[in-house]
Amino acid sequence: MSIQKIHAREILDSRGEPTVEVDLHTAKGHFRAAVPSGASTGIHEALEPRDGDKKRFLGKGVLKAVEHINKTIGPALIEKKISVVEQEKIDKVMIEMDGTENKSKFGANAILGVSLAVCKAGAAEKGVPLYRHIADLAGNTELILPVPAFNVINGGSHAGNKLAMQEFMVLPVGAASFHDAMRVGAEVYHSLKGVIKAKYGKDATNVGGEGGFAPNILDNHEALELLKAAIAQAGYTDKVVIGMDVAASEFCRDGRYHLDFKSPPHTKRYITGEQLGEIYRGFIKDYPVVSIEDPFDQDDWEAWKRFVFHVDIQVVGDDLTVTNPKRIAHGAEQHACNCLLLKVNQIGSVTESIQACKLAQSHGWGVMVSHRSGETEDTFIADLVVGLCTGQIKTGAPCRSERLAKYNQLMRIEEALGDKAKFAGRKFRNPKAK
């Protein structure tokens, strides 16, 4: 069944900033998708153009992207009468109409909004759940529930504290199911609130943009100590491990790293990539850290390679790879990381997201599906992670509705699958392994 009508509008994301929402109509019904947006963005991401009119939303409006959908993309797709189950064909039409490598003509936010809505319509057309449709598009027969990586302490560009490193996460790998993982994660989160309140006072339990706590601490070791104490207090030392998203590109200055970058610049505080790697190795030795994302700048390839060679944990590329096949291929060739962070809006279409995932997996990498800091109530990535069988997802703390929307959808999916539900657990890095 082909598309009958497409209408896009400007809505607000979880940060109060404009983003694109798309309504798509077929004979089967009405399908809606909303596009997320990042705060710490990689310079190599597909372009998400803003209007630039300082009198509207401080220049961050997306009316041009909305207009591209309503006046160009929508009419072209309706005219072509392509069935909504043909995801790749529809995405290809939009990409070719845009004609640029980084989607700068229409914008990744315009193309992705339509692509997500098409995928939802395709599932309805086939009469299957969205996660099953995505699995079919990816050629997967299995369906796997992921380990959630809860971002429970926020720093970096996600919080107004002095903490340089952006996310400190807990992963309930020892849980028996996704429902159990949610319970464990929520209990650790509440335990952490108590630990922070007892040590720093009630105002230290304010939350950041992704629902994690944002105590005004500077030392990254201190954040890890808080997590270690909260996990122990909740009684889950044997079930919960720690992940980090350093987002080091945010504090890299001329090839060196400034761990107090929110204070006035002071070159004596800058350290080299090698010194930063030593700090990470200390974290791995002293704490149950099993995953570190973006430990170095997005173009500091030598530091990445050196670090991956010396550690056996998961090293995740986000700003390094930006869900882009060329960057993934180069990263694999350089042995620069061993896991892709998959963000649909970095590449700008469902088809290219699936291709990026499969490319990373073909190199033996893990894949972690991710939200963005500017989120909406859209739950697409919950179905995506199950259909792609990546085994891991990060979509914030168990706090703030735009984060819980995804986690709650995953619980519904697990319930719907019943005894066929498979939870990645300790195999989260390679969930298909027998």
From Swiss-Prot:
One record GO biological process: glycolytic process
Catalytic activity: (2R)-2-phosphoglycerate = phosphoenolpyruvate + H2O
Pfam assignment, any one: Enolase_C
Primary location class: cytoplasm
Binding, substrate: H158, E167, E293, D318, S370, H371, R372, S373, K394
Residues where Mg(2+) binds: D245, E293, D318
Active site: E210, K343
Modification type N-acetylserine: residues: S2
GO CC annotation: cytosol; phosphopyruvate hydratase complex
Compartments where located: Cytoplasm
Superkingdom per UniProt: Eukaryota
Gene Ontology MF terms: magnesium ion binding; phosphopyruvate hydratase activity
Cited NCBIfam families: eno
Function: Glycolytic enzyme that catalyzes the conversion of 2-phosphoglycerate to phosphoenolpyruvate.
UniProt name for this protein: Beta-enolase
